[in-house]
C-alpha cells in the first residue's frame, strides 16, 4: 500500500513539474493528461505545437499511424477540438477500443499499399499525417509513397522516430545505409 501511494505521489509531482515547464498549449495538455498511455518523446510537443497550432479549431483530417496505447488520439482530440476528424491506424485489432466520438481507429497494415489507398479514399484529403507506426523503413517508405499525394497542399506529413533508420539490430539500419527513410529524405532531397 505504501509503495502505491509513493508511486502516485511521484507521478503527481512529475506532472506538476511538466506543467510548470510547459510553454505551449500542447505541452500543457500532455502535462495534465491522465487518460490512455501515450508514448512520445517530450521534445516533439513544442515542435508540434509550432506547426500544428494553425489547425486548432478547424475542420481537419488527422491520420496517425500507430495507435499503441491510444493516448495520443485523446491528446489530438483535445488539442484540435470537436471539428477535427481524427483517425488512427494500427495492425492490432484491440486498438479499436480507443475509438470515441469523432475519433475512429482503422485496422490494417501500413506495409500494404492497396489498403492505404482504400483508407485514403475513405477518409479523404489529409491535413496532418503522423507516421508513428512500425518504424521499419520499408513501411515508412511504402506509407510515404502511397499517402503523401493525399496530403492537402497546406498539410503536414510527419514521420516520427527516424532514429530507427540508424539501428542495425532491430531495424537493419545504419549510418548512410541505402534504403532507409532518412537516406530517402536526406539532405540532398
Protein language model features and the residues they cover:
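A short alpha-helical cap/connector motif
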Residues: 1-130, 134-159, 163-189
Amino acid at each position: 500500500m505504501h509503495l502505491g501511494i509513493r508511486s502516485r505521489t511521484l507521478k503527481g509531482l512529475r506532472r506538476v513539474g511538466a506543467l510548470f515547464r510547459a510553454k505551449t498549449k500542447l505541452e500543457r495538455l500532455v502535462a495534465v493528461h491522465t487518460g490512455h498511455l501515450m508514448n512520445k518523446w517530450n521534445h516533439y510537443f513544442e515542435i508540434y505545437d509550432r506547426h500544428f497550432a494553425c489547425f486548432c479549431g478547424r475542420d481537419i483530417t488527422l491520420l496517425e499511424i500507430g495507435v499503441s496505447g491510444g493516448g495520443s488520439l485523446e491528446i489530438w482530440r483535445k488539442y484540435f477540438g470537436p471539428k477535427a476528424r481524427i483517425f488512427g491506424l494500427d495492425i492490432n485489432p484491440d486498438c479499436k477500443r480507443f475509438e470515441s466520438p469523432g475519433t475512429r481507429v482503422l485496422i490494417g497494415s501500413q506495409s500494404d499499399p492497396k489498403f492505404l489507398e482504400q483508407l485514403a479514399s475513405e477518409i479523404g484529403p489529409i491535413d496532418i499525417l503522423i507516421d508513428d507506426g512500425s518504424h521499419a523503413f520499408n513501411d515508412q517508405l511504402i506509407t510515404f509513397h502511397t499517402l503523401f499525394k493525399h496530403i492537402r497542399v497546406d498539410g503536414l506529413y510527419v514521420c516520427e522516430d527516424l532514429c530507427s533508420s540508424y539501428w542495425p539490430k532491430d531495424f537493419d539500419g545504419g549510418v548512410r545505409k541505402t534504403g532507409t527513410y532518412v537516406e530517402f529524405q536526406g539532405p540532398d532531397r
